[in-house]
Amino acid sequence: MAQPSMSLTLKRLESDDASRSLQDMDPLNDSSNDNNILGIDEPLKLKSKKRIAKVDNERVLNKPQGLPYLIKNHHRLGRIVEQRDKKFAKQELRKLQSIHHSYKTPRQLKYDHEVETLGSILHFYQLWCHGMFPKANFKDCAYLVRNLGHRSSQLRLYRRELIEKEIFKLKVSKGIIDESSEVATRESESDGFTNTRSGNNDDSGDIFVSTGDNVYQNQMEFSGAQGQELPSPTLSEQATEQMERNDAAVSAVAAADDEYDDDWSFMNLELGIDAAPAPPSSSSSLPLSKSSNGLLNGSDKNNAETGTANREQYNNFDYENEIQNENENEIENEDDIDLAMELMREHDNI
C-alpha cells in the first residue's frame, strides 16, 4: 500500500511545480509589473527625425549649387565651345592651304569634334549635379530634376520668366522693339496697377479688386483721369512697314474671298417670269445652240427677228444622260433574262 501513495504524492508535486512555473512565466500575474505593462513608467527617449535627402525647390532654387550656379557659369561653357570650334576651323584651313585646294574635311573628323564638344557639355552638367545632389549619379539626378520641373509650379514660373527675358533680348537685338520705351511701358503699367489696387481699397479694409472689375479697364480710367495716356511699345520703321504690308495682303485675300462668296450666279438655273431679261450684247444677238457643257439654249420664240436668248433655259447635264443610258441597259438586260427563262421552260417541257 505504500507504493501507490508514494506515486500519488510524486504526481501532486510535479503538478504543483508545473503550475508554479506557468504562473512565474505569466507577466499578468506578477504584481510588481502591473504598472509597467503598457510601458508608462519607462523613460522616453527623444530622437531627432532623420532627414531624407531629396531634390526640391529649396535645393534647386535657393542654394548656390542649384540653378544659380548654372545661370552664373553657363556663359563659360558657351565660350569653351566657341573656342573649340574656332580651333577646329583653323586646323582645317591649314590643311586646305597646305595639302590641296580641293581638300574637304572628312565626315568622321567632324563627328569626332562634335562628340568632344558634347562630352565637355555633359562633364559640366555632371559636376553641377554632383555638387547639388551628391548621393545620386548623373542619370538619377537628371531624372529627379526633370520630375521636379513637371511638378513644381514655382519652378515652371521661374523657367517662363527666363524664357521671356531671352525673347525680349532677341527682339531688342533684331530691332523689333525699343528697349528704353519697353522698359518705360512696363514701369508705367506696374505703377498704374499699384495705383488701381490702392484706389479700390474702401473703408472696410478690403485690399482686393472689387468683383467684376477689370484691372486693365481700371488702369485706363485712372490714367485718363490724370490726363495721361498709357504709352505703347514703339516699333521700328522696318517692323511697321512689314506689319502694314501683312495687313494689306490679309485684307486683299479677305476681299477676294468675300467677292467669291457673293457670286451667286451659278444658282440662277431657272429665271422666273418676272425676272428682268439680260441686257442684249453682241454675243447674245445670235441664236444659241447646245454648248459644250451640255446646256441647251433656244432662241426667243416671241421675238424671232432679234434672235435674243430665251428666258427659259433647259439644262441637260452629262450625268443625267449617263443615268438614262444605265436605265436603258438594265431594261435590255431584263428582257434578255426573261427570254432566256422562257427558252429554258420550253426545253424542260419538251
Swiss-Prot record:
Say which domain of life the source belongs to. Eukaryota
Q: Which GO terms describe its cellular component?
A: replication fork protection complex
Q: Which GO terms describe its biological process?
A: DNA repair; DNA replication checkpoint signaling; meiotic cell cycle; replication fork arrest; replication fork processing
> What GO annotations for molecular function exist for this entry?
DNA binding
Question: How does it associate, per the subunit comment?
Answer: Component of the fork protection complex (FPC) consisting of TOF1 and CSM3.
Q: What does this protein do?
A: Forms a fork protection complex (FPC) with TOF1 and which is required for chromosome segregation during meiosis and DNA damage repair. FPC coordinates leading and lagging strand synthesis and moves with the replication fork. FPC stabilizes replication forks in a configuration that is recognized by replication checkpoint sensors.
The entry's family comment says: Belongs to the CSM3 family.
Q: What is this protein called?
A: Chromosome segregation in meiosis protein 3
Q: Which gene encodes it?
A: CSM3
